Design a protein with these regions (language model features):
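Secretory targeting signals
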Residues: 2-6, 11, 52-112
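Long, hydrophobic alpha-helical segments
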Residues: 3-26
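Hydrophobic/aromatic residues in alpha-helical transmembrane segments
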Residues: 16-20, 68, 101, 179-180
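Helix-loop-helix units of permease transmembrane domains in multi-pass membrane transporters
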Residues: 23-53
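Transmembrane helix-loop junction
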Residues: 26, 38, 70-74, 107, ...
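Flexible extramembrane loops and terminal tails that flank transmembrane helices
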Residues: 34-45, 110-114, 181, 185-190
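Terminal transmembrane helical anchor/hairpin motif
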Residues: 115-183, 188-190
Length: 190
């Protein structure tokens, strides 16, 4: 299971921006965003709906990898079920964070390729933060490490559920969804 939990976040660095690049950018490019703005839904409801659609797709892809777990169980491998469940939960949270960043990137532009590039840049920065600690002043090292997605995922992949990790994931998701909503509201009135 450790190999799956090590490689999946790397795949997510490009897969999730590809999934989320068209969430809002396609609506803008096709001109349907004006129609959506006239509907009786609030901007945050629209953003949340787009975000949840991408998270659903990510979780569906994650469910397919359960075949790996069931195969290991069938061949008699000794599996720590707590760590496996926490690892899958952590992968879902990492996917949710990256999807929120991708949703924000998609709201910034009407070009899907540009949205993809912005999203890849954002998620790579969040993934690399704890790997760049040697370049950071000692006083900032703890903060920079705490901002890294990989730092929090590593705890979950080992089977450790810490409230700090859950608060981190919820905060980053909320932050990007808030930015997306505000960005769309500003552009709505332009």
């Amino acid at each position: 299971m450790r190999a799956l939990f090590n490689i999946t976040p790397l795949v997510y660095l490009f897969f999730i921006p590809a999934v989320s690049m068209s969430l809002v950018a396609r609506e803008k490019n096709l001109g349907t965003i004006e129609l959506i703005n006239t509907l009786p839904i609030k901007t945050h409801e629209f953003v949340l709906g787009k975000y949840l659609a991408s998270v659903t797709l990510i979780v569906a892809g994650l469910v397919i990898t359960l075949v790996h777990l069931f195969t290991l169980i069938q061949v008699g491998t000794n599996i720590d079920y707590g760590a496996a469940i926490c690892g899958y939960f952590g992968l879902a949270l990492v996917g949710a964070v990256y999807a929120s960043a991708g949703t924000f990137a998609s709201s910034v532009t009407d070009n899907q390729v540009v949205a993809f590039i912005i999203a890849v840049f954002i998620v790579i920065v969040f993934w690399l933060l704890d790997k760049m600690l040697i370049f950071v002043p000692v006083g900032l090292a703890g903060f920079v490490q705490f901002m890294s997605v990989d730092y929090h995922f590593t705890n979950l992949s080992r089977g450790v559920i810490d409230s700090r990790n859950l608060i981190y994931f919820a905060s980053v998701i909320g932050f990007f969804l808030f930015l997306t909503t505000k960005n769309m509201e500003v552009k709505k009135w332009k």
